[in-house]
A protein has these predicted regions:
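Hydrophobic ligand-binding cavity/cleft-lining segments
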Residues: 1-68
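Short aromatic-glycine motifs in intrinsically disordered, low-complexity regions
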Residues: 68-78
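Hydrophobic-ligand binding "helix-grip"
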Residues: 76-115
């Protein structure tokens, strides 16, 4: 049975730089009993039925459409914009995206573990400019966000 666990961001990961006072950072991981390449993970993540639902919401509410072809291009480092996000940083086996408002980060990483692959998904939320803490709206949605993050890795 697949299990998803909360963990700290791996040391020296692209997400780790957002670990500072006032920011919210989370990281979840699961292990798959087969080799999974980074492009396969990124494409698979952004084309699940659950994430496609988020993509539809983004298209309807903020006019940020996306396609499976764009998810494939993102996974192959052919484009730097996808739906509501822009690539902030990439390295071998990981990607950090920033939303169009500049407050939320989305992060994916793969780590080979013998014949298995460890998959990571994390988020960072930074306070609004001029604020030292996250606003009530985000804090109110935190429980939903955490459950949603876990479901995205199933």
């Amino acid at each position: 049975m697949l299990s998803v666990e909360k963990c700290p961001p791996p040391e020296n990961s692209l997400l780790e730089k957002h670990l500072m006072n006032g920011n919210y950072v989370d990281c979840y991981t699961t292990t798959i009993d087969k080799p999974v390449s980074f492009p396969e993970f990124v494409f698979g993540f952004y084309t699940t039925w659950l994430f496609k639902t988020e993509r539809l919401i983004l298209k309807a509410l903020v006019n940020k459409p996306s396609t499976d072809l764009q998810a494939k291009q993102l996974s192959n480092a052919e484009i730097d914009h996808f739906a509501a996000w822009t690539v902030e940083a990439r390295s071998e086996g990981e990607i950090l995206l920033c939303d169009f408002v500049g407050r939320t980060r989305s992060w994916l990483m793969v780590e080979q573990a013998g014949a298995a692959t460890k998959l990571y998904f994390g988020s960072a939320v930074v306070p609004a400019k001029g604020s030292v803490s996250l606003d009530f709206g985000f804090r109110a949605m935190l429980g939903f966000h955490q459950i949603y993050s876990i479901l995205l890795l199933y």
